[in-house]
Amino acid sequence: TDAIDWVKTLKGAEGLSKIVEKGKSSFVGHEISGKTLGVIGLGAIGVNVANAAVGLGMNVLGYDPYLSIDGALHLDTQVKTSDLDMLLKTADFITVHVPFTPSTANMFNADTFAKMKDGAVLINNSRGELVDNAAVVAAVESGKLERYITDFPADQLIGVKNIICVPHLGA
């Protein structure tokens, strides 16, 4: 959002394209090619995310103890299966695509964050209840997690630096 706000300030500026070219380096994010994405949950959405990440040049690890035959058949052959601990330890980015059940409640907690690679980014577009909010705030504030992105805003998360909350737009 900082980049969007910055561009809005440029309205009417002379030499706009030169200003944009010069200033855009302030907003450069991660180069994802060659980085490792961990996909937790390989249902229809998880498979699509994993396959897209392969297409973007990422190394992809997938974890799903309930992977269906259909899911496996649609999964790119470059996606490697992993156990959860190895995925947490290895992935630069982790995206979660599992349902909320009693066994997935707070699956991301202080113990889980301790197993994760330092500086990892966690993306949760599944359910808010999968993540212990106090633990994720602590992990982000300590630098253990570089960033947490979710579409389940909670009061405890809104306004915390390096936590991005957007509205849930699930179909």
Give, region by region, the residue ranges found by the protein language model.
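N-terminal Rossmann-fold NAD(P) dinucleotide-binding loop
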Residues: G46-V47
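Phosphate-binding beta-alpha-beta segment of Rossmann-like dinucleotide-binding domains, i.e.
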Residues: T1-T36
